């Protein structure tokens, strides 16, 4: 009996041991499967986050502060090589640096110039001087003339023709692929006289690439282009007249530039920005999304005629600037481009695409004539803009008579803020300030404003944008006047009430009717 019990006890122990091993293996298997599932989920989450981050990443266009931009200023006589001294009559301009409404320069991530195989029908790679030559290319992604050297090059009375479209996209916009004439790698190039003609997609006329393919804030490699007395004509889309990117420096004198394609500003900049000085000449655009000037840079223009026949007159994106001195600017914006839902002559905005840093945009105009044939004279959206006007003749031919609108449009991510500084200026029209917008109006040095403020805004597509006025702050010095053309509501008023001519209407400040007005 004892042995039988012992036998059964041993059998029981064996069964328990086998059962335990089986359970242990099963438990281990379950843990392994669970861990694998968690690892897979974690990997999936990481992949999703990485992909989302990549999709949301800025595409690396110029940073707008241009803190390290080339410091070359135009030559004193506007006739020789740049010597660092601003010419007489050429504005020094603000130090701040900043795609027209969709369809303009820029876009998604654009890689780098190191990824591009540059080709030229004629290549100049050392110091040279050529006159009366013909340069031609009908090959895609090939320039007619490629100047790639750190030396000085002079080209006189050239005939340049470029055909052969490119699908290079941002490689054309940012780095100069397929341009009729491409100047890069620290070259110091002077082009005088001659004609430059391109009839292809992505074929800018003359492209000055400063080597900094990233966002603004980094200096270029010293590439400098001086071009004078030349005729530039482009007909394809994405084909500006004179194009500056990557911190390049361009000086243009007495040019005749005509563009016909979409996204083809006669004076055009893109990723990496740069500095552009223009004195004299005629600049005309006929295409959609092709203002006469598109700024992702610091641009100064004097004594020039600027005409846009379909698009805005000029466009500034982000923390960038345009300064006009004694220019005649005319725009007839009759077709909205992509996200845009207003017609306007001066467009200041931020797309949040990464093509320009966010910050204060600056438009300054002194003297000259500003003619707006259709839409609002000024339109500010999704950015902080400063508009300086001094002795400008403003002609508003649009029936609605809107001088300035500050409100939502087709972009979001930043506020709608504008400051209008009028000095010795006569202004007339309606100021539209959306319910989530802020306008500061400063009238000084004998300025006169005839008009009112409203928050009732409908865009060109017929959609209601705002029904109530936002924040409006007005400062009126002792030499300036404001004549009302309707009951007006502002948030604050600084100045002598007697300088406000009510004209039978009432000015309300923070909801209270102002007294002491005329």
Explain the meaning of each model-derived region.
Residues 468-471, 484-494, 508-511:
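Surface-exposed loop/turn positions within long extracellular repeat scaffolds
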Residues 504-518:
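Extracellular, surface-exposed repeat architectures
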Residues 30-115, 212-219, 352-355:
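Disordered, low-complexity segments in secreted/periplasmic proteins that are enriched in proline
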Residues 26-28:
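Bacterial signal peptide processing site
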Residues 21-24:
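C-terminal motif of bacterial Sec signal peptides marking the signal peptidase cleavage site
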Residues 2-11:
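Bacterial N-terminal signal peptides that target proteins for export
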């Amino acid at each position: 009996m004892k042995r039988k019990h012992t036998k059964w006890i041993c059998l029981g122990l064996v069964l328990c041991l086998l059962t335990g091993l089986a359970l242990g293996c099963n438990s281990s298997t379950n843990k392994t499967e669970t861990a694998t599932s968690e690892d897979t989920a974690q990997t999936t989450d990481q992949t999703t986050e990485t992909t989302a981050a990549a999709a949301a990443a800025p595409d690396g266009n110029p940073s707008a502060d241009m803190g390290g931009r080339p410091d070359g200023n135009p030559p004193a006589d506007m006739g020789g090589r740049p010597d660092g001294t601003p010419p007489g009559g050429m504005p020094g301009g603000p130090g701040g640096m900043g795609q027209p409404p969709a369809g303009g320069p820029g876009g998604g991530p654009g890689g780098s110039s190191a990824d591009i195989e540059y080709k030229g029908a004629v290549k100049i790679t050392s110091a040279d001087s050529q006159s009366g030559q013909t340069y031609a290319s009908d090959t895609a992604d090939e320039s007619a003339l490629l100047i790639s050297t750190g030396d000085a090059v002079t080209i006189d009375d050239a005939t340049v023709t470029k055909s052969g479209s490119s699908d290079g996209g941002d490689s054309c916009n940012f780095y100069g692929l397929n341009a009729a004439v491409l100047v890069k790698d620290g070259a110091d190039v002077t082009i005088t006289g001659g004609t430059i003609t391109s009839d292809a997609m992505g074929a800018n006329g003359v492209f000055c690439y400063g080597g900094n393919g990233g966002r603004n804030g980094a200096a270029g490699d010293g590439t400098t282009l001086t071009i004078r007395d030349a005729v530039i004509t482009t007909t394809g889309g994405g084909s500006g007249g004179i194009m500056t990117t990557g911190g390049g420096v361009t000086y243009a004198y007495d040019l005749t530039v005509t563009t016909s394609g979409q996204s083809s500003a006669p004076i055009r900049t893109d990723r990496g920005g740069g500095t552009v000085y223009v004195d004299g000449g005629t600049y005309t655009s006929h295409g959609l999304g092709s203002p006469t000037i598109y700024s992702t840079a610091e641009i100064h223009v004097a004594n020039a005629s600027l005409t846009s026949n379909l698009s805005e007159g000029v466009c500034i994106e982000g923390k960038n600037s345009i300064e006009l001195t004694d220019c005649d600017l005319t725009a007839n914006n009759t077709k909205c481009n992509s996200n845009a839902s207003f017609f306007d002559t001066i467009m200041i905005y931020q797309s949040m695409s990464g093509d320009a840093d966010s910050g204060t945009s600056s438009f300054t105009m002194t003297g000259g004539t500003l003619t707006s044939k259709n839409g609002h004279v000024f339109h500010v959206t999704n950015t902080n803009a400063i508009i300086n006007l001094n002795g400008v003749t403003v002609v508003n031919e649009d029936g609605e008579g809107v001088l300035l609108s500050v409100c939502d449009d087709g972009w979001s991510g930043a506020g709608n803020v504008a400051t209008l500084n009028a000095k010795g200026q006569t202004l007339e029209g309606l100021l539209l300030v959306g319910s989530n917008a802020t306008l500061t109006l400063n009238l000084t040095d004998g300025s006169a404003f005839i008009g009112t403020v409203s928050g009732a805004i409908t865009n060109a597509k017929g959609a209601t944008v705002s029904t109530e006025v936002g924040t409006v702050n007005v400062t009126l010095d002792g030499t300036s006047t404001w004549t009302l053309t309707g009951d007006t509501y502002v948030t604050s008023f600084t100045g002598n009430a007697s300088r406000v001519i009510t004209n039978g209407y009432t000015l309300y400040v923070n909801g209270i009717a102002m007294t002491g007005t005329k």
